């Protein structure tokens, strides 16, 4: 006899299957590409898209929502826009752009999205962070009080930089801006070799809109100096699209913030923000935003201020970490009154102004002391530095003024002639070859000799001052390292006596050679 099921049983089985059926509906926020022009895609749809949200095109290329209209969204393409075609489907990710962070990135060269550009293989970072984050608040900060040594005499003595400061490097092209930044990174090797893990200074170098050959030279120099092991290089070269150049400094800042927020110290170089502003101007004009002065959009100040405000010295409760920023801005014919230079000057805590005229006269680094200033760095200077550097800036300024006066050829009295002669020795002592940073203790010795032992120094011919300096520093390093070590704290009468005796004997020996 065949089993037969009545209608009620069949109905109950169907009802049970329907009630237990579980196939959740997945909703996706999608849109369709209407047009693509110069790295900007206009997309119809994406009703739930958020400003700054990351999206994916059908080809796998990423993009960021930077413009929201009634029915359309303007998306900057993070890659080759040839891979994006009209009619392609675009999907929202629900997230903003993130980059890998941590010690795993040290010694690596990455692009603005954190993807490796060297031959070091995949980066397996344990942490990722949003590239856009809020700057630390007032309560979370602490005043700058720890020095960041650059190894460059004229900067450490006259324009001191502290950890957590933002110091602008500004000047015309090809007069040593990048060299100052690189020497600062290289000098941290001496510091890092002598301190514990939490006191080390890690570095991030962000190359924006530069030639790939130039970036390769920078990376090779860092390798040769042993500085790449504590440095991450973020590259958005001239051949990269404008959105990648725009993102690069934010990505680099995020990498630096990892160290800052974990009680460590980081130095970040933005090379340079002029090209960053040009990239943002290009994007804004393509997004049809109204142009302002020099065709820059109205929010260009905010673009740089929200980046540079993330550099800070953190409070005790927040771990006492720091992020020090050295942005670089290129001027045209020394014009610091242009839009981007004035903006960045007003945001930062001081500026190091490089002058073409000084550079071509042979005074390198070509720092114009009259226009350069550090508004907070003096609080971070060592006591020994303050004692010898106080009168140096005034002496140099007086020499520059008297130098112009002496050109008229009039008779000069003895005091003016003495000031001129002292100024010539000071200028020679402040000159420094690139990629040869000097410890702060050695700088103190040289400036103490100028300020207090000029009678000894004047026995050396002007043409031999650089050789005298080189030999004297080596003499202190090899024969009297204990004296240099004492200078790392303060300078008392005993140390002054030791320096006087050492220098007097050395001058006699030097002149006899």
Curated annotation (Swiss-Prot):
It holds the Pfam family ATP-synt_ab. CDD domains: ATP-synt_F1_alpha_C, ATP-synt_F1_alpha_N, F1-ATPase_alpha_CD. It comes from Wolbachia pipientis wMel. It catalyses: ATP + H2O + 4 H(+)(in) = ADP + phosphate + 5 H(+)(out). The record marks 372 as: Required for activity. Keywords: ATP synthesis, ATP-binding, Cell membrane, CF(1), Hydrogen ion transport, Ion transport, Membrane, Nucleotide-binding, Translocase, Transport. HAMAP family: ATP_synth_alpha_bact. GO terms for molecular function: ADP binding; ATP binding; proton-transporting ATP synthase activity, rotational mechanism. It is found in: Cell membrane. Belongs to the ATPase alpha/beta chains family. The keyword Methyltransferase does not apply. Produces ATP from ADP in the presence of a proton gradient across the membrane. The alpha chain is a regulatory subunit. F-type ATPases have 2 components, CF(1) - the catalytic core - and CF(0) - the membrane proton channel. CF(1) has five subunits: alpha(3), beta(3), gamma(1), delta(1), epsilon(1). CF(0) has three main subunits: a(1), b(2) and c(9-12). The alpha and beta chains form an alternating ring which encloses part of the gamma chain. CF(1) is attached to CF(0) by a central stalk formed by the gamma and epsilon chains, while a peripheral stalk is formed by the delta and b chains. InterPro entries: ATP_synth_asu-like_sf, ATP_synth_asu_C, ATP_synth_asu_C_sf, ATP_synth_F1_a_nt-bd_dom, ATP_synth_F1_asu, ATPase_a/bsu_AS, ATPase_F1/V1/A1_a/bsu_N, ATPase_F1/V1/A1_a/bsu_N_sf. Gene3D superfamilies: 2.40.30.20, ATP synthase alpha/beta chain, C-terminal domain (1.20.150.20), P-loop containing nucleotide triphosphate hydrolases (3.40.50.300). It is a peripheral membrane protein. Its main location: membrane. This is ATP synthase subunit alpha. GO terms for cellular component: plasma membrane; proton-transporting ATP synthase complex.
């Amino acid at each position: 006899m065949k089993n037969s099921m009545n209608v009620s049983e069949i109905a109950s089985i169907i009802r049970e299957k329907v009630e237990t059926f579980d196939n959740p509906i997945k909703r996706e926020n999608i849109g369709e590409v209407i047009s693509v022009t110069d790295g900007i895609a206009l997309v119809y749809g994406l009703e739930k898209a958020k400003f700054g949200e990351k999206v994916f095109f059908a080809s796998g290329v990423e993009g960021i929502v930077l413009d929201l209209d009634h029915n359309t969204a303007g998306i900057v393409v993070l890659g080759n826009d040839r891979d994006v075609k009209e009619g392609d489907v675009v999907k929202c990710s629900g997230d903003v752009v993130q980059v890998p962070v941590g010690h795993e990135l040290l010694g690596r060269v990455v692009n603005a999205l954190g993807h490796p550009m060297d031959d070091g293989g995949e980066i397996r970072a344990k942490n990722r962070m949003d590239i856009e984050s809020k700057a630390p608040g007032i309560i979370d900060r602490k005043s700058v009080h720890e020095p960041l040594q650059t190894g460059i005499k004229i900067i450490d003595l006259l324009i001191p930089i502290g950890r957590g400061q933002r110091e602008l490097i500004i000047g015309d092209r090809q007069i040593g801006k990048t060299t100052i930044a690189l020497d600062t990174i290289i000098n941290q090797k001496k510091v890092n070799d002598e301190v514990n893990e939490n006191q080390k200074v890690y570095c991030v170098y962000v190359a924006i809109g530069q030639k790939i050959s130039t970036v390769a030279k920078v990376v090779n120099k860092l390798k040769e100096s042993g500085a790449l092991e504590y440095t991450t290089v973020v590259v958005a070269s001239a051949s990269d699209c404008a959105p990648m150049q725009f993102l690069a400094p934010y990505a680099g800042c995020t990498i630096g913030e990892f160290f800052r927020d974990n009680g460590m110290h980081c130095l970040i170089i933005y090379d340079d923000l002029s090209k960053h502003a040009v990239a943002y101007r290009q994007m804004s004009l393509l997004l049809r935003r109204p142009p302002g002065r020099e065709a820059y959009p109205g929010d260009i100040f905010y673009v740089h201020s929200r980046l540079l405000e993330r550099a800070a010295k953190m409070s005790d409760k927040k771990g006492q970490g720091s992020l020090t920023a050295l942005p670089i801005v290129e001027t045209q014919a020394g014009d610091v009154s242009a839009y981007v230079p004035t903006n960045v000057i007003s945001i930062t805590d001081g500026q190091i102004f490089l002058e073409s005229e000084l550079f071509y006269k042979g005074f390198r680094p070509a720092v114009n002391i009259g226009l350069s200033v550090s508004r907070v760095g003096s609080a971070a200077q060592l006591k020994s530095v303050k004692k010898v550097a106080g009168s140096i800036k005034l002496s140099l300024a007086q020499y520059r003024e008297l130098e112009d006066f002496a050109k008229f050829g009039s008779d000069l009295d003895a005091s003016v002639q003495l000031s001129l002669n002292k100024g010539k020795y000071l200028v020679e002592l402040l000159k420094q070859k690139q990629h040869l940073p000097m410890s702060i203790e050695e700088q103190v010795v040289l400036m103490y000799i100028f300020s207090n032992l000029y009678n000894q120094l004047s026995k050396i011919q002007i043409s031999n001052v650089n050789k005298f300096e080189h030999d004297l520093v080596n003499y202190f390093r090899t024969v009297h390292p204990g004296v240099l070590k004492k200078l790392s704290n303060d300078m008392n009468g005993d140390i002054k006596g030791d320096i006087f005796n050492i220098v007097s004997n050395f001058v006699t020996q030097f002149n006899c050679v």
